[in-house]
A protein has these predicted regions:
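Terminal helix-turn-helix DNA-binding modules in bacterial transcription factors
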Residues: 51-93, 112-114
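Short, Lys/Arg-enriched, Trp-marked, Pro/Gly-tolerant hinge/linker segments that flank
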Residues: 1-19, 23-33, 37, 51-59, ...
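Basic, low-complexity segments
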Residues: 39-43
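…primarily DNA-binding HTH/wHTH and HhH modules…
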Residues: 97-114
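Short hydrophobic/aromatic patch on the recognition helix
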Residues: 45, 94-95, 99
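Residues within the helices of the helix-turn-helix
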Residues: 32, 81, 108
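Core residues of bacterial helix-turn-helix
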Residues: 38, 87-88, 99
């Protein structure tokens, strides 16, 4: 029974993390922000999320940012610099490096293709 209670609590924390992520990914990409909000350590958050979803908490954050970045590149007339700032990157270069590292192509190439 104790294990079942722990599983319920773990699922609740993971659900809370995802809810926080939906509301905050544009401004907060650091794991510590989310773990602090949930009153747990970053390591424990990572363990719970990975155990429950087979994807790390960091990957969840990264995916939300990339999905939004792709949507903005496809459907808006905003410049890459404007999108970078909207997603709280220091500048276009930082966003472009992040985007290329995750997707394999630059934001401008993504925009041209899609």
């Amino acid at each position: 029974m104790h294990s079942e209670d722990e599983n319920i609590e773990s699922r609740g924390i993971v659900q809370d993390f995802i809810a926080l992520l939906k509301d905050n990914y544009r401004k907060h990409r650091d794991l510590t922000f989310y773990s602090d909000k949930l009153s747990i350590t970053p390591k424990y958050l990572t363990t719970l999320v990975k155990g429950s979803t087979s994807k790390s908490a960091h990957k969840w954050i990264e995916d939300y940012v990339i999905i939004e970045g792709k949507a903005l590149l496809r459907s808006s007339n905003k410049t890459i610099e404007q999108i970078s700032l909207e997603l709280s990157f220091n500048n276009q270069d930082v966003f472009s490096k992040f985007f290329k590292r995750v997707t394999g192509i630059s934001p401008s190439e993504y925009r041209r293709r899609f």
